């Protein structure tokens, strides 16, 4: 009987209607049971009734502040990480060679179907400021820049990491500054005279299963519990040198541009940090039976 007349039949009105095939294929068949039911018409005989199994593949993403382009991001505590950047191109403009590329730091991969991103670990510098002291050199008073060790970063009860793309995802707090942050970082242990390991509390963004995420960039910055930006405001991006120390004196030359010994160099190791993220990506695979 025609389906239009069956609509008035109480015994059949709730049955699934017959699908119309197109070139012998039902275009809606892929939506029945999501098309993932095992109908025993596959070559493999070790598959479960539900063919689809989703697992999470976890990736480590490591970011060093020293890898940033300090002409774009002079401060090591404020920069943007780009994922899967555009390819580098060169062109000639008014007789000058111009290179077009995303400024470092970049991660040459893209992350789609993301279930979570988590701050796994972080290494921070004790010191972010310098001070000037007077030194008597052969009867002349000369001002010298020194690391200001009287105001370590650990004077703060904790440090907050902000990620612009994931603000306020984890915390409900009486401190609005904390509520807008991605992670709270407490002092854990000293690893050198200049750096310490932070203990991460929270620091995770979880995407719902029906709305998995895509990570294109991470705009990172750091603040104190009072919302004050943590920065190294004395650094000078005008200083240009490669990552090689050619100083004759292990303590550094007096007027060196060396990145290791010039306290104004944006890549001076004393002021850098290291971040380790874990990103979980949902990966579909066949749901196979395991035989012992």
From Swiss-Prot:
Keywords: Virion
Localization annotation: Virion
Domain of life: Viruses
GO cellular component assignments: virion component
Designated name of the protein: Uncharacterized protein L352
Species this chain originates from: Acanthamoeba polyphaga mimivirus (APMV)
């Amino acid at each position: 009987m025609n389906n239009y007349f069956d609509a008035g039949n109480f015994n059949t009105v709730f049955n699934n209607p017959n699908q119309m095939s197109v070139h012998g294929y039902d275009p809606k068949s892929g939506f029945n049971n999501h098309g993932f039911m095992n109908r025993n018409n596959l070559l493999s005989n070790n598959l479960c009734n539900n063919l689809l199994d989703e697992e999470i593949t976890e990736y480590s993403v490591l970011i060093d502040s020293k890898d940033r382009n300090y002409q774009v991001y002079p401060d090591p505590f404020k920069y943007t990480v780009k994922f899967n950047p555009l390819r580098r191109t060169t062109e000639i403009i008014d007789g000058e060679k111009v290179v077009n590329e995303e400024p470092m730091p970049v991660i040459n991969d893209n992350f789609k179907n993301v279930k979570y991103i988590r701050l796994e670990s972080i290494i921070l510098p004790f010191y972010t400021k310098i001070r000037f002291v007077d030194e008597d050199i052969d009867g002349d008073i000369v001002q010298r820049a020194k690391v200001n060790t009287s105001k370590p970063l650990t004077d703060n009860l904790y440090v907050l990491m902000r990620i612009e793309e994931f603000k306020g995802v984890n915390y409900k707090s009486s401190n609005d500054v904390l509520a807008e942050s991605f992670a709270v970082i407490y002092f854990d242990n000293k690893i050198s005279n200049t750096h310490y390991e932070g203990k991460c509390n929270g620091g995770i963004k979880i995407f719902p299963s029906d709305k998995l995420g895509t990570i294109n960039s991470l705009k990172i910055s750091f603040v104190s519990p009072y919302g004050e930006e943590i920065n190294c405001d004395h650094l000078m991006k005008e200083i240009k040198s490669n990552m090689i120390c050619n100083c004759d004196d292990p303590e550094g030359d007096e007027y060196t541009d060396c990145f290791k010994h010039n306290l104004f160099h944006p890549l001076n190791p004393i002021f850098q940090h290291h971040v380790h993220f874990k990103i979980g990506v949902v990966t579909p695979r066949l749901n196979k039976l395991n035989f012992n």
